[in-house]
Every structure is written in structure tokens, then in C-alpha cells.
Amino acid sequence: MTLPTVAIVGRPNVGKSTLFNRIAGERISIVEDVEGVTRDRIYTSAEWLNRQFSLIDTGGIDDVDAPFMEQIKHQAGIAMTEADVIVFVVSGKEGVTDADEYVARILYKTNKPVILAVNKVDNPEMRADIYDFYSLGLGDPYPVSSVHGIGTGDVLDAIVGNLPTEVEEENPDIIRFSLIGRPNVGKSSLINAILGEDRVIASPIAGTTRDAIDTNFVDSEGQEYTMIDTAGMRKSGKVYENTEKYSIMRSMRAIDRSDVVLMVINAEEGIREYDKRIAGFAHEAGKGIIIVVNKWDTIKKDNHTVANWEADIRDQFQFLSYAPIVFVSAKTKQRLNKLPEMIKRISESQNRRISSAVLNDVIMDAIAINPTPTDKGKRLKIFYGTQVSVKPPTFVIFVNEEELMHFSYMRFLENQIRQAFGFEGTPIHLIARKRK
């Protein structure tokens, strides 16, 4: 399901990031960061009144060395391109500025709903000053104090009230995949090579309400795929295509919509921090993952090259031990024919269900190999386990005390489950729960 998108715009130092964090904090649960993985909080999911949406802090994308007005124009352009709803943040302390009027003129030309949030209204006496902002011509201003959380509920109500009313349910039989990675790792060439591999290509379809174009194709066995364009990778002339943070944001959006993610690494440049950040986001999101090393034709090789690369990848991406690695060349089409089959196989792993009886046989065998741990004389007791969901496969293990389930033993159980059932290319989640 594609979530509607809300973009926060405004000149520097009006509190965009504070409002972003305040809205993100309204979520019931926020996925924990994987240890050793950091990511810029410029894109997240939020929920209000049972409506979910994606939230973009455009200020996090700015090139700080760019001219002031260019930064603002950049933000507004992103919002107009990406968003279903725009939150325009201004400062109640400073009043209407030339920069605010400049942004308002740009936003006034869009047909997107714009919510005017007057931030830094930190006490009731300041509320009278918000009426000056009617001069921007963007409707009612909403007084907000992001720091204190005052007024954010009203802004969220306005956001939800302006979200698209219908969200199209996607066909569960279609496998959705995307190629992500740093700019210039060869994603576009890979996409074109994959789509040129004797596939039946359907007409491009609008992937969202914005400018992203998805491509459907069918393999020789009749399996349908949707390749999710990382919003503009196949188009020329995208103004911000090489802006790394912008690329991160668009990759995150593509990951959200994907079942399987192809993490593309440039063999000529090796692994960078960006690669680990994006891969960490895909892992946290529970997506199937394939590590694709492109431009393999350019590498001088000996008998140890593949093994050395694989060892380095496993060391750099320790949290992706389950992800297969494939070395390809979009230029020579080396091993490209393997990718659709790998995508299909990993999608099957994502959707695999294990019966409770078979699962518990594996758990009991695991306990026989490695008895449950003790803490202060009290031993962990596992009663039974059951699979509760797919995409990713998630298992609940019922125990006597949740605190006794050490991380290391949970990892041991995960390894035993993988050894028994495979689950290639997909994270699996194990949750310890006290039996009532």
C-alpha cells in the first residue's frame, strides 16, 4: 500500500525539524535503529486518527553551501513534486518575512493543499500576532509550539483532513521490487538491462499521485512483477538526482513500497557509508534484500577476488547475513538473467508460513543442542512458538519470563529456524512473550 506523503517546508530556523520530530513522536511505535546503522531522519512514517502517512523534512535535504533562496526554492520544488499535502512552517516570533512571501508565491501556484503552521507561538499572548500571516494568502494559520507540543494536534487534524481519501490496494500476487543505491552506481543501466531481457513489458503505470512511474512485466512462467522506479531514475534532467540526501529520501520511499530490494553497489568504488545506511533502512523495514555488485566487468580478478569481496560485504553488512550476493554487469549482461528468479525466490521466503507443529519440533531440537540460559538461578522456559505474520516472517515464542530470553539465545533460535527452513534473503523477527 502506498502511503500519502506530507512535506514540511519553510526557511531555515523556523523549527521544521522540531515539528517533524514532534509529529513522528506521535506514532504508537517507532522501529528501533539497527545497531551500527545510522540514518538521517528526513523521512519517516507517522499516524494520526488511524491514518498513516509518510513525512518528509525538506530542510534535511538542503545543501548548506547553496544560496539562501536557492535552498528555499529547492525545498518548495521537492514538496510540490513529492507531496500530497504541504506543511509550510513560519515563525511567529519573527513575523512575515520576504523569504516567507517568496515560498508562499511558489506554493500558491500548486494545486496541493497547504497547511500554514505558525511555529514558536510559545505563550497565549503571541496568538494575536498570527493574523499577520493571512497576508500570505494560504488560508488559516495554525498557531504551534513545536518545542512544547502545543497546537500540533490541530496541524495533524488538518493534515489528515486533506489526505487523499482513497488508497488503492495493491495486488498481492504481483512482486514489487526496487533498485536502490548511491547515485551513479548503475541503477538505470541495470533497470534497462533487466527490462530488456525478453520480458513482456506492460505500459508504464502511474505509481503514485506524483511523478514516479512503475513498470510492470511478466516472466516466462507468468509471474507478474512491478519494478518501482526510484522516482525519476530513468528520466533525464532531474534537478536533484545527485543530491545524496535527496537520493536517500527517494530510496526510502521506494523501499516502503517494495517487497524485495536490490541493494546496488558500484564495484569500482566499493562500499560506502551511504550503502550501509540505506541497507539498514531496508532491513528495519523487514524487506527482502539482494546485494547486487554492479560493474563487475571492470574489476581485475584472480581466484580469490569473489571470496574477498564476499568476506568484505559480510563484514560491512553484518546485519544482512541472510542476503544473497550476486556480481553482475549491466554493460555485458553478466548474470542479469539470475535476478528475476532470485527476486521470486526471496518473495516466496517473505511469504512462507511454517506450521506450529513443525516449528516447535525445531525449537525443541534447538533446546536439546543448546539448553536455555539461566539468570540468578532462574532458567528460561520455552513453552511453544507460533508464526503470527509474513512479510517479514514473524514468530512469537511464549516463555515463562521475557527478561530471561537473552539476545544471544534469540539469535541462536533464529539461526536454527533459518537452518531448518531457509528464509533466504528475508529478515525474520522473533518476539518473546510471557505466557499468561
Swiss-Prot record:
The biological process GO terms on file are: ribosome biogenesis
Q: Which CDD domains match?
A: EngA1, EngA2
Location of the EngA-type G domain: 4-167, 175-351
The highest taxon in the source lineage is: Bacteria
Start and end residues of each KH-like domain: 352-436
Q: Which family, according to UniProt?
A: Belongs to the TRAFAC class TrmE-Era-EngA-EngB-Septin-like GTPase superfamily. EngA (Der) GTPase family.
- Stated name of the protein: GTPase Der
Q: Which organism is it from?
A: Streptococcus thermophilus (strain ATCC BAA-250 / LMG 18311)
Gene from which this protein is expressed: der
